[in-house]
From Swiss-Prot:
Lineage: Eukaryota, Metazoa, Chordata, Craniata, Vertebrata
GO molecular function terms noted in the UniProt entry: DNA binding; molecular condensate scaffold activity; RNA binding
Protein name, as recorded: Surfeit locus protein 6
Composition bias type Low complexity, residue spans: 177-186
InterPro entries named in the record: Rrp14/SURF6_C (IPR029190), SURF6 (IPR007019)
Extent of Polar residues compositional bias: 23-39
UniProt similarity note: Belongs to the SURF6 family.
Encoding gene (name): SURF6
Species per Swiss-Prot/TrEMBL record: Homo sapiens (Human)
Cellular localization per UniProt: Nucleus, Nucleoplasm; Nucleus, Nucleolus
Ranges of compositional bias, category Basic and acidic residues: 57-71, 81-90, 163-173
Length: 361
């Protein structure tokens, strides 16, 4: 910003110098015209006041002072612009010297020069607000700009390559899909799809809609083999009751018909074996069920005892806090009564307690 101010001050001072150079020549021409006319014409006219010249001198002094103050801050910028300013000054001097007879046109030319210089100054300011010219940048800044440009070009090329690859892949997929559609016969689409099977390296998922609750219940009943629900789960009491009910039914059937009882028992064993082959854990051992039930009841009793102990501890702690609170309240009440009696004794009152202690009552 200091360099811009220095340029502005220098251009303004240059324009004022050009105007001041043209002013003496104009005055000399007017003096010559007046002397020639005075010889031929009548009495001399009054001289005009040189207010314009004084105003220009004042402006020149202010501009020089401003240029000095800014030149101390940025001497390099002002020095860099000196050759161009010298050329412009020489051009304006030659133009003013080439037309000595045209005295009336010097003032508009100076105004035009100021406009041109001001326009150039605005162009420089706009250039500095932007990226700036490459001549004024340091080598490090130029190298940084070059690297940034290379990086932008590289990213642009990479994006273009990715777009081209994506486009080629989509076109290839479209052609493959078209070939598959053309290769499949029309009757193949109407055939019902077989239920998906389990392959160890591949799992096929059917596109059927999820079954409702009633459908799932029906499928579960169909999965029950031989109308025999498997004895699974961790509700040992229920499992033991079911197992005992089966044994009682077998005993009743054995009392009626031994052959049917043996057939039913064999059917139950085969059904349990089929369930076990599928990975279902069958709990059909009465001894193990009783032991598991005892362990479960024991753990439940232990949890119940721990809970009761914890509850009793909580109640005991609450009672202790209540007793401590009541004791503190009684102590505070006794202390307040003692303080009241002490204040009464200080005032000279004779209390019944004092009479009892003295044995006067």
């Amino acid at each position: 910003m200091a360099s811009l101010l220095a340029k502005d001050a220098y251009l303004q001072s240059l324009a004022k110098k050009i105007c001041s150079h043209s002013a003496p020549e104009q005055q000399a021409r007017t003096r010559a015209g007046k002397t020639q006319g005075s010889e031929t014409a009548g009495p001399p006219k009054k001289k005009r006041k040189k207010t314009q010249k004084k105003f220009r001198k004042r402006e020149e002094k202010a501009a020089e002072h401003k240029a000095k103050s800014l030149g101390e801050k940025s001497p390099a910028a002002s020095g860099a612009r000196r050759p161009e300013a010298a050329k412009e000054e020489a051009a304006w001097a030659s133009s003013s010297a080439g037309n000595p007879a045209d005295g009336l046109a010097t003032e508009p030319e100076s105004v035009f020069a100021l406009d041109v210089l001001r326009q150039r100054l605005h162009e420089k300011i706009q250039e500095a607000r932007g990226q700036g010219s490459a001549k004024e940048l340091s080598p490090a800044a130029l190298e940084k700009r070059r690297r940034r440009k290379q990086e932008r070009d590289r990213k642009k090329r990479k994006r273009k390559e990715l777009r081209a690859k994506e486009k080629a892949r989509k076109a290839e997929e479209a052609t493959e899909a078209q070939e598959v559609v053309e290769a499949t016969p029309e009757g193949a689409c109407t055939e019902p799809r077989e239920p998906p099977g389990l392959i160890f390296n591949k799992v096929e998922v059917s596109e059927d809609e999820p079954a409702s609750k009633a459908q799932r219940r029906k499928e579960k009943r169909q999965r029950v083999k031989g109308n025999l629900t498997p004895l699974t789960g961790r509700n040992y009491r229920q499992l033991l009751e079911r197992l005992q009910a089966r044994q009682s039914r077998l005993d009743e059937l054995r009392g009626q018909d031994e052959g049917k009882a043996q057939e039913l028992e064999a059917k139950m064993k085969w059904t349990n074996l089929l369930y076990k082959a599928e990975g279902v854990k069958i709990r059909d051992d009465e001894r193990l069920l009783q032991e598991a039930l005892k362990r479960k009841e024991k753990r439940r009793a232990q949890r119940q005892r721990r809970w009761e102990k914890r509850t009793a501890g909580v109640v005991e702690k609450m009672q202790q806090r209540q007793d401590r609170r009541r004791q503190n309240l009684r102590r505070k009440k006794a202390a307040r009564a003692e303080r009241r009696l002490l204040r009464a004794r200080k005032k000279g009152r004779i209390l019944p307690q004092d009479l009892e202690r003295a044995g006067l009552v």
